[in-house]
């Protein structure tokens, strides 16, 4: 620096800053306040000419004007020549400009001050540091205020003008703000930090500039007075608080202060004032002590130092003290900062923004944050924000928009969208409140187009004097526009906002409404829809079923209506509103995202990983990129070239584009995981300068896992493949991630559980993906653009569809907006639903929260479905992989693959979709067909045997022959091989002969394990006989053709835990399955092979192999004979290509769970595996045991029983073992058990004694089976469909343990009279028995004929109408008939055939009332006391003899009386059973046995009535035991009596309730038995006395008087029947006989002899004996020769039924009771008649 000087800069003072000695401290010369532009600033002698510059780069028009008051005080003072100050605008230099500290020396770190802002030597002059203060002349200099922090500044703005960037010129105006570049002075600027460390010389005191008269506290400059010499020290020790200058902002970024902020005469920028003070107030007493304080009485206010926006200081920054002179203390505002802010806000006019966001909504694809920012930038300058409010229905508005408004601190007022003008009323109220709160001047910004605001705007403008700014749409009314001061079109206002989504395309104005109630008339629904959409101008076009169509005048109205109407209630249904009809939703989804549906606002990306994209070069701004193909900032990521320093900086980064890059460079991408999950992502990057507009037309909602490259050329494919980034995702959404790939072409690994390691399936693991090409992903539609589908299963089918939809709507709406809820029909008895949510994040949250959430009585299963077009492809990819992974070499012919696919998944395959799965499969032309192959990158590691085996040791037990990764193994054991010169190359595999041995597995198994132990776990199969002979002796080998032996290789594989593997050199090796001995307690079944999962053709082939080999001798067949044997057995060719194989050996190796290949070379043998043999033997053994009557067989008799059952000799080698016990021991104990019985081993089926409850449940199950099969075609169904059908039909699970069984087949066998199990090959068919089939067919015929006119049908039309009614054809052969006429003969109890003129006609028979028959049969059964049960034939005879009419069940609709009785399950116990005499018998249930006792009890009472509260005691005394209703399943006596309505009924109320016997039960047909109590307590009488009658009823005591006509007995006073041998009145009265209660009846009797007896008594008669305990009248027949001397003897009082009288006298007809006495109006049943009308009631209490 040539102009640098070494003189102390503080030795002299500047002249114009120097005071006169005689002047007062507060007097200044105003002429010294301005520097003359004509004079140059004198410099030190070392200063060169280039330091002189007479031009100043400041124009007056660029400087804020000083205060008007101050300018008027000095009118005579000439201002400097402004024109001389002007100079051309000079572009800023790219070199950072710094300011010079005038108090510092020319330190090497200090740069010279450049005046004029020029970049060249002539454009400005440089002033060396220190030279400013050396001059003795009176010139002006300015000390800039800046930060002492030195670092490289940001690149300068390219459009900045020179007039806004002064470098260091002294200002002539005290209130102007100067630009200040960051200071590089390490000592800090003099007005900045006050702690100087290296100041040399004297410290200068800066005196305050005298204030203008009009503005006493105006800011001024301070002269540099004489500093006291000394060492550098703290300036603050010499400066008083009152001498601190007000803040002078010199920040170049703060020159936008228009109008300037004037605070008591000082000018501040708003940015500086908005910053809080960082330090406390400095002690005023220690600062500027020699300068008197200013003339003010107010406390100083601290103002933060303008340190440059966006920069930070290095330490404690000094605050500037500002004195106020208006006489108001700032302390009343609290802190000084609050006081300053309050003063500032008082001087700014308020502004309020009122936004009708439903009228002027945030445009699609734009952010609400950008709109709010635009409003504030446009209108808020010079104002203070007093109100910013928007009104909307937050449940209808986009949640992202609401969140953005909240983030912008905008008041969001919620209103009900369906209420008319709710938003307008709320805004009008807010406008009125604003006018009441604030006064003019104030500004109101209204964002709306509604004319309803015209009145409020008029008052605000004309009465309150507010400034009105109206932001409106094009269709605004003139009445509204007239009242605004400023008009701004809303479309223009937001037109240049950067779009974040594709621009909205024109669309229809129709809205489709779904889920309308079907039970309401169309007019009501139309009125409701019109009310919902009236505010938006909607019109209901038509209503069809559950949907409707509404029309709107424009798209905006339709969108508003969709928000308001979505999920609204219409007569109990939550409606679904859409722009597209349901039939076209799929097509619309596959088309462009912006064509048919409303483009949703951007969603916040909830990516748990933060993407840091580094070193991505800039793309050319002029690139003609299609939408989605340009450079784009990825959501949740930031782009920059420098290192990212903080997360806050990362969120503020912008995407940069260069202008010189012609070939974009491929950068390296990496995904790094932050320590915690972020619930929100960084804000979208704003539009960078020069970025093409097409870049913003992409869809940022696309969430691509692969980073999108900025290039669109396919040449760089290799570069992209090298660019990987790693992502961690929860394993539950692994398939979802695959669906979100940009393109399936670049997927590195498929999403399949077969090729992922366990740690990848069980936790979130990094998975590698290829970086996707931007041009590839941009063309495909966004999978979740139109919503995300959530699949729900395990729904409660008991709920109605409407309830399910409503419950799911409520549950899912708590986690986000639900677009639709759709229920699928019942498919395989599974009810499923699909809930469509608006975005992916809400769907994931719903899945996490609602999985296994209980709806109804079930816990739903929730899973996430993939989206839109990729949904079907992702599903197809998974389905394809599941098929091909089970195919040989992962390939199948196309036709075979198509067949397998359609059979497995039940829907057609579109072959063209296979060509789209380029990352999963490849379709190759092979010969005359095409081959579908799984790509190596997608398939799991396959062993040579196919996918059923894996290479880990834990699953190598899938086959006895396993190809394992044994690199090499010796073909023989060198230790025990007799041929020491054995050469592997000379060995001929065809020469190997398979040995057949006879060994017990019980002995052989431990020997094999011991042999493996001594041979380190492996023994070559060729040397196994030699090694075994060396250890245990020679094997017992038999000839193959002689039989009786088992192949040694097969017997080895029968040992649990041992297998035979094949090394890579083809040598078979005997080894342990897990390369170690099995644990001693291991279940052998855990060590067996397992069936393959997948290919149904291979499963069918395995069944055929079993069927073929079990018919071969010893189940062994040479491999060369397999094809001819197959052809002969199945009468069809075994086409290997049909299964996708090219060689037979490959097909045979594909079923290792059933087929074992023995030997080697061309002489290999085929046999069944031990697992298949055990399963086969188990089935045969169960069939054998079930054929036995006792379900068991003695081991010694097993061979004979086997021969009887299967018609062939028993040979244990047929099942691959040598002893029966070897294979029986393999069967689980729950299937077969061995027991000892009389020193004999017994094989039996384990049977648990079922409880009575289980038996009862089984009976009910049989009824359920009948009900279920009656709904099936032909009353039959497949065995494997029973469980799902039962679950669907009855709504409950069929639990076998509930019935006491462990297998379903056993349960079916327990109901053989109901169900038959037919075996058709491998399939089982369930069908009803013949009797049940006819009963079901009869019910169908009744239904069919009743639906016809006149209940008849022509015989020729029967089969046709049957098929039409029931949906399937009628098969006569199922009923063993050949014609309909023969069928009607078997259904004679239902239909009859009538000959008509037109032909034979089938008619329903007229059935008799079954109710009356039921009552009659019940009376018979209750009257029967002979035995506990009664035969059906005897019951029929008894009925016919009693009612003198034949009992024909066909008249009642039943084929037999047995079937009729079975239809009365509540009356008849066990329905109908067979006794020892093979007779069908029947007995009453326990409940009706109780009813029988109740009937007998009520018969002992007058009128057969009894009070309810006395019933329990009377019953207990009558029966002899306490009545317990709970034993019958009831909680009270009243409920128990109510369960037998056929017997009794209860009438009355309260305590007057009476138990009354039904009229049908009053007839005493054969009431011959005694009471139960007497029958139990008294000894039996001699049989000849107590005879059980066979036919007519016996004589009984008859009470009552009256009759239909004259009768001789009416004249009797008291007598017995004619055959009575005893005079009762003359006999001694028994002591147990109580006195009767005689109540005279007021009937006038004729005079007669009251005591007249017969002269000639008859032989037998009846006496009435009262039971001593129960006091019940019991008629007992007495014969003369057997009459005891004491009538009270036990023999006489025995309570047994009495025989009828042998007299030839016919029993008299029963007499009628007086109608006034008995409500029953029935004839009396007593033989003993009283002349007087006495009520003979028994005494129950003594």
Curated annotation (Swiss-Prot):
Subcellular location: Peroxisome
Keywords, comma-separated and alphabetical: Differentiation, Meiosis, Oogenesis, Peroxisome, Phosphoprotein, Repeat, RNA-binding
Sequence ranges of Low complexity compositional bias: 673-689, 1703-1712
Entry GO terms, CC: cytoplasm; peroxisome
Residues in RRM domain copies: 788-867
Modification Phosphoserine occurs at: 65, 757, 1089, 1091, 1571
SMART domains, per database record: RRM
GO biological process, one term: regulation of gene expression
Keyword check for Amino-acid biosynthesis: no
Pfam families, A to Z: MARF1_LOTUS, NYN, OST-HTH, RRM_1, RRM_MARF1
Molecular-function annotations in GO: CCR4-NOT complex binding; RNA binding; RNA nuclease activity
Keyword ATP-binding: no
Residues with Phosphotyrosine modification: 696
Disordered: region residues: 620-642, 655-721, 1678-1729
Function, as annotated: Essential regulator of oogenesis required for female meiotic progression to repress transposable elements and preventing their mobilization, which is essential for the germline integrity. Probably acts via some RNA metabolic process, equivalent to the piRNA system in males, which mediates the repression of transposable elements during meiosis by forming complexes composed of RNAs and governs the methylation and subsequent repression of transposons. Also required to protect from DNA double-strand breaks.
Protein name: Meiosis regulator and mRNA stability factor 1
Organism expressing this protein natively: Bos taurus (Bovine)
Name of the encoding gene: MARF1
């Amino acid at each position: 620096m040539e102009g640098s000087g070494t003189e102390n800069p503080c030795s002299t003072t500047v002249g114009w800053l120097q005071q006169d000695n005689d002047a007062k401290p507060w007097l200044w010369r105003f002429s010294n306040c301005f520097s003359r532009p004509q004079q140059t600033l004198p410099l030190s002698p070392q200063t060169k000419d280039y330091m002189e510059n007479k031009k100043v780069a400041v124009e007056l028009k660029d400087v804020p004007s000083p205060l008007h008051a101050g300018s008027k005080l000095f009118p005579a003072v000439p201002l400097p020549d402004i024109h001389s100050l002007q100079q051309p605008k000079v572009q800023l230099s790219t070199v950072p400009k710094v300011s010079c500290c005038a108090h510092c020396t020319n330190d090497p770190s200090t740069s010279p001050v450049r005046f004029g802002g020029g970049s060249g030597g002539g454009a400005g002059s440089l002033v060396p540091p220190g030279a400013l203060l050396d001059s003795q002349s009176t010139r002006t200099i300015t000390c800039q205020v800046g930060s002492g922090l030195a670092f490289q500044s940001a690149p300068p703005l390219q459009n900045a003008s020179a007039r806004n960037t002064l470098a260091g010129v002294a200002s002539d105006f005290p209130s102007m703000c100067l630009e200040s570049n960051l200071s590089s002075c390490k000592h800090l600027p003099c007005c900045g930090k006050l702690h100087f460390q290296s100041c040399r010389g004297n410290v200068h005191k800066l005196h305050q500039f005298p204030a203008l008269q009009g503005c006493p506290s105006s800011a001024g400059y301070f002269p540099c007075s004489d500093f006291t010499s000394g060492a550098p020290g703290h300036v603050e020790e010499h400066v008083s608080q009152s001498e601190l200058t007000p803040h002078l902002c010199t920040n170049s970024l703060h020159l936008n202060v228009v109008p300037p902020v004037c605070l008591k005469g000082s000018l501040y920028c708003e940015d500086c004032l908005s910053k809080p003070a960082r330090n406390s107030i400095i002690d005023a007493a220690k600062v500027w002590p020699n300068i008197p304080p200013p003339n003010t009485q107010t406390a100083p206010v601290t103002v933060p130092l303008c340190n440059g926006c966006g920069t930070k200081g290095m330490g404690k920054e000094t605050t500037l003290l500002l004195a106020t002179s208006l006489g108001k203390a700032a302390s009343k505002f609290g802190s000084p900062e609050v006081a300053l802010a309050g003063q500032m806000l008082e001087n700014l006019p308020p502004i309020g923004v009122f936004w009708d966001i439903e009228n002027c909504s945030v445009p699609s694809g734009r952010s609400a944050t950008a709109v709010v920012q635009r409003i504030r930038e446009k209108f808020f300058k010079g104002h203070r924000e007093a109100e910013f409010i928007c009104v909307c229905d937050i449940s209808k508005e986009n949640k992202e928009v609401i969140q953005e408004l909240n983030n912008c601190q905008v008041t969001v007022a919620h209103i009900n969208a369906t209420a008319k003008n709710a938003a307008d009323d709320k805004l009008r109220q807010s406008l009125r409140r604003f006018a009441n709160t604030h006064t003019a001047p104030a500004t109101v910004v209204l964002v709306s187009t509604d004319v309803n605001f015209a009145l409020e705007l008029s008052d605000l403008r004309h009465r309150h004097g507010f400034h009105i700014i109206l932001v409106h749409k094009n269709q605004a009314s003139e009445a509204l526009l007239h009242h605004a001061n400023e008009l701004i079109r809303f479309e223009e206002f937001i037109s240049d906002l950067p779009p974040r989504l594709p621009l909205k395309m024109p669309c229809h104005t129709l809205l489709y409404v779904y889920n309308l109630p079907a039970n309401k008339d169309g007019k009501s629904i139309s009125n409701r829809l019109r009310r919902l959409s009236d505010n938006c101008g909607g019109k209901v076009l038509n209503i069809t079923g559950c949907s409707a169509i509404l029309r709107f005048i424009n798209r905006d109205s339709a969108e508003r209506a969709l928000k308001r109407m979505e999920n609204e209630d219409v007569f109990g249904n939550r409606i679904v509103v859409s722009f597209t009809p349901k039939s076209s939703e799929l097509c619309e989804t596959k088309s462009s995202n912006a064509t048919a549906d409303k483009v949703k606002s951007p969603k916040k990306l909830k990516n748990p990983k933060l993407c840091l994209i580094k070193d991505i070069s800039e793309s050319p701004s002029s690139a003609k990129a299609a939408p989605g193909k340009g450079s784009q900032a990825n959501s949740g990521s930031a782009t920059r070239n420098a290192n990212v320093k903080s997360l806050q900086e990362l969120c503020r980064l912008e995407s940069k584009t260069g202008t010189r890059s012609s070939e974009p460079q491929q950068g390296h991408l990496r995904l790094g995981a932050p320590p915690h999950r972020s619930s929100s992502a960084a804000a979208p990057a704003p539009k960078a300068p020069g970025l093409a507009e097409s870049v913003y037309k992409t869809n940022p909602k696309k969430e691509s896992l692969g980073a999108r490259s900025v290039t669109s050329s396919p040449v760089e494919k290799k570069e992209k493949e090298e660019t990987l980034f790693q992502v961690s995702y929860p394993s539950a959404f692994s398939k979802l991630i695959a669906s979100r790939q940009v393109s399936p072409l670049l997927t590195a690994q498929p999403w399949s559980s077969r090729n992922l390691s366990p740690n990848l399936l069980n936790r979130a693991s990094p998975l590698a993906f290829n970086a996707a090409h931007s041009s590839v992903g941009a063309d495909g539609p966004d999978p979740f653009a139109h919503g995300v589908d959530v699949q729900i299963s395990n729904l409660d089918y008991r709920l109605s569809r409407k309830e399910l939809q409503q419950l799911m709507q409520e549950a899912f709406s708590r986690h986000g907006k639900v677009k639709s809820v759709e229920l699928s029909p019942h498919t395989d008895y599974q009810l499923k639903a699909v809930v469509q949510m608006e975005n992916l994040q809400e769907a994931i949250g719903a899945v996490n929260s609602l999985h296994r959430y209980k709806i109804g009585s079930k816990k739903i299963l929730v899973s996430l479905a993939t989206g839109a077009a990729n949904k079907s492809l992702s599903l197809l990819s998974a389905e394809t992989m599941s098929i091909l992974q089970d195919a040989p070499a992962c390939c199948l012919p196309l036709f075979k693959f198509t067949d397998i696919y359609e059979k497995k998944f039940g829907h057609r395959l579109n072959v063209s979709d296979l060509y789209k799965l380029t990352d999963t499969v490849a379709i190759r032309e092979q010969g005359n067909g095409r081959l579908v192959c799984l790509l190596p990158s997608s398939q799991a590691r396959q062993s040579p045997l196919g996918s059923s085996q894996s290479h880990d040791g834990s699953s190598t037990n899938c086959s006895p022959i396993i190809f394992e990764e044994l690199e090499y193994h010796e073909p023989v054991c060198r230790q025990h091989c007799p041929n020491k010169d054995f050469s592997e190359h000379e060995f001929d595999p065809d020469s190997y002969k398979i040995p057949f041995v006879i060994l017990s597995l019980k002995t052989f198994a431990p020997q094999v394990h011991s042999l493996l132990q001594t041979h380190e776990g492996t023994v070559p199969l060729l040397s196994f006989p030699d090694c075994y002979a060396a250890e245990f002796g020679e094997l017992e080998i038999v000839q193959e053709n002689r039989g009786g032996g088992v192949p040694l290789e097969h017997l080895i594989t029968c040992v649990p835990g041992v297998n035979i593997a094949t090394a890579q050199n083809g040598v078979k090796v005997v080894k342990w399955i897990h390369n170690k001995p099995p644990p001693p307690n291991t279940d052998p079944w855990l060590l067996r092979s397992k069936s393959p999962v997948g290919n149904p053709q291979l499963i069918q082939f395995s069944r055929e192999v079993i069927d073929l080999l079990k018919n071969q001798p010893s189940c062994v067949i040479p491999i060369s004979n397999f094809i001819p044997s197959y052809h002969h057995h199945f009468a069809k060719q075994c086409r290997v290509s049909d299964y996708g194989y090219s060689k037979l050996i490959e097909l045979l190796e594909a079923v290792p769970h059933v087929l074992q290949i023995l030997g080697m070379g061309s002489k290999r043998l085929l046999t069944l595996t031990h697992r298949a043999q055990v399963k086969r033997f188990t089935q045969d053994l169960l069939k054998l045991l079930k054929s036995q009557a006792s379900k068991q067989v003695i081991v010694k008799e097993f061979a004979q029983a086997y021969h009887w059952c299967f018609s062939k000799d028993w040979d244990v080698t047929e099942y691959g073992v040598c002893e029966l016990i070897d294979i029986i021991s393999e069967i689980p104990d729950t299937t077969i058990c061995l027991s000892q019985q009389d020193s004999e081993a017994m094989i039996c089926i384990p049977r648990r004694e079922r409880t009575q409850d289980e038996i009862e449940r089984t009976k009910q199950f049989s009824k359920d089976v009948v009900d279920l099969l009656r709904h099936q075609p032909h009353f039959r169904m497949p065995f494997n469909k029973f469980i799902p059908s039962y679950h669907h039909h009855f709504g409950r699970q069929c639990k076998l343990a509930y019935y006491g069984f462990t297998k379903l087949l056993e349960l079916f066998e327990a109901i053989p009279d109901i169900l038959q199990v037919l075996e058709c090959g491998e399939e089982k068919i369930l069908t009803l028995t013949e009797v049940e089939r006819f009963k079901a067919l009869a019910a169908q015929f009744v239904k069919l004929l009743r639906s016809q006119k006149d209940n008849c049908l022509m015989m020729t039309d029967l089969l046709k109408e049957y098929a039409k009614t029931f949906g399937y054809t009628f098969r006569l052969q199922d009923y063993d008939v050949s014609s309909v006429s023969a069928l009607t003969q078997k259904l004679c109890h239902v239909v009859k055939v009538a000959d008509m003129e037109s032909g034979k006609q089938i008619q329903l028979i007229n059935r008799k009332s079954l109710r009356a028959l039921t009552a009659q049969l019940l009376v018979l059964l209750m009257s029967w006391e002979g035995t506990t049960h009664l035969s059906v034939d005897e019951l029929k005879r008894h009925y016919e003899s009693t009612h003198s009419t034949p009992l024909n069940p066909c008249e009642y609709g039943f084929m037999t009386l047995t079937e009729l009785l079975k239809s009365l399950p509540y009356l008849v116990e066990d329905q109908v059973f067979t006794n020892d005499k093979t007779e069908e018998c029947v007995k009453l249930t326990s409940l009706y046995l109780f009813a029988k006792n109740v009937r007998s009890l009520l018969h002992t009472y007058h009128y057969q009535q009894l009070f309810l509260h006395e019933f329990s005691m009377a019953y207990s005394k009558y029966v002899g035991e306490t009545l317990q209703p709970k034993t019958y399943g009831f909680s009270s006596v009243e409920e128990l009596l109510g369960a037998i309505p056929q017997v009794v009924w209860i009438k009355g109320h309260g305590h007057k309730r009476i138990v009354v016997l039904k009229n049908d039960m009053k007839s005493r047909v054969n009431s011959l038995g005694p009471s139960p109590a007497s029958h139990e307590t008294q000894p039996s009488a001699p049989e000849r006395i107590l005879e059980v009658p066979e036919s007519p009823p016996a004589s009984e005591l008859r009470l009552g008087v009256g009759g239909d006509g004259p009768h001789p007995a009416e004249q009797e006073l008291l007598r017995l029947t004619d055959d009575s041998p005893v005079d009762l009145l003359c006999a001694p009265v028994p002591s147990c006989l109580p006195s009767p209660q005689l109540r005279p009846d007021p009937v006038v009797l004729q005079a007669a002899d009251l005591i007249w007896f017969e002269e000639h008594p008859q032989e037998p008669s009846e006496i009435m004996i009262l039971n001593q305990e129960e006091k019940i009248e019991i008629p007992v027949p007495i014969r003369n020769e057997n009459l005891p001397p004491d009538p009270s003897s036990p023999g006489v009082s025995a309570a047994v039924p009495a025989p009828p009288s042998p007299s030839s006298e016919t029993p008299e007809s029963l007499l009628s009771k007086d109608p006034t006495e008995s409500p029953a109006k029935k004839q009396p049943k007593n033989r003993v008649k009283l002349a007087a009308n006495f009520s003979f009631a028994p005494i129950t209490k003594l």
